[in-house]
Swiss-Prot record:
The gene is rpsJ. Belongs to the universal ribosomal protein uS10 family. It comes from Acidiphilium cryptum (strain JF-5). This is Small ribosomal subunit protein uS10. InterPro entries: Ribosomal_uS10, Ribosomal_uS10_CS, Ribosomal_uS10_dom, Ribosomal_uS10_dom_sf. GO terms for biological process: translation. Part of the 30S ribosomal subunit. NCBIfam families: PRK00596.1, rpsJ_bact. It comes from the Bacteria.
Length: 102
């Protein structure tokens, strides 16, 4: 696996769970001898929904809800076979979407 990079993108609604998962990945990669670049915080995607407060009248009375999707980016430079094995066995928290590109 010479001169290859592993790019890991993480997404979650809760930034604390996301940061803990990122920390676990970084610690695992460093423990196996790989060099880690990041975590790089990517822009938070905010999706807003506007609904009427009343089901019948009062169009001017509305309520807004939002979902925030937090994202992080990690690059693992020159991973060893032990790094890949350790990352495959890593058990991350529920609610974190992991996307890996080699």
């Amino acid at each position: 696996m010479d001169s290859q990079n592993i790019r890991i993108r993480l997404k979650a609604y809760d930034h604390r769970v996301l940061d803990n998962s990122t920390r676990e990945i970084v610690n695992t990669a460093k423990r196996t001898g790989a060099q880690v670049r990041g975590p790089i915080p990517l822009p938070t995607h905010i999706e807003r929904f506007t609904v009427n407060r009343s089901p019948h009248v009062d169009k001017k009375s509305r309520e807004q809800f939002e979902i925030r999707t937090h994202r992080r980016l990690l690059d693992i430079v020159e991973p060893t076979p032990q790094t890949v094995d350790a990352l495959m066995k890593l058990d991350l928290a529920a609610g974190v979407d992991v996307e890996i590109k080699i």
